[in-house]
Amino acid sequence: MFRNVRLACAVLGVLALLIGTSASAQETKVKLDAQNNSGESGTATLTPAGDSTNVVLDVKGAEGTQPTHIHKGTCATLDPKPSFPLSPVVNGKSETTVKASMKDLTSGGYAINGHKSAQDLKTYVFCGDIKAGM
């Protein structure tokens, strides 16, 4: 009887480990670095949502409402035209579901950036490259 209990516990432990691993393997974190001496930095968390991707931004030092986007390119060479608009960062937080798969976004060639304000879109305050294979 004790042998069956130990076996059942071992099976449950393995299942819990597998479930935890698959959930975290689907989530991708992107480091957001300060730009133009803004002092703003944080993390973008990308999670698959079917053929779309949920993007959650957590930005420290952000003030007011700041437009954010996913652009083609890297932080060093952003295409000025946004590929996917994100909900503005308000009080350091933003959450958006974009119509792009995780596979597409993590194939390389995209970056997430934030602008100082709707009136000053040319000043980037944070940026993070979505690297291939993340």
Range-by-range predicted roles:
Residues F2, R6-C9, L15, I19-M134:
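N-terminal leader/targeting pre-sequences
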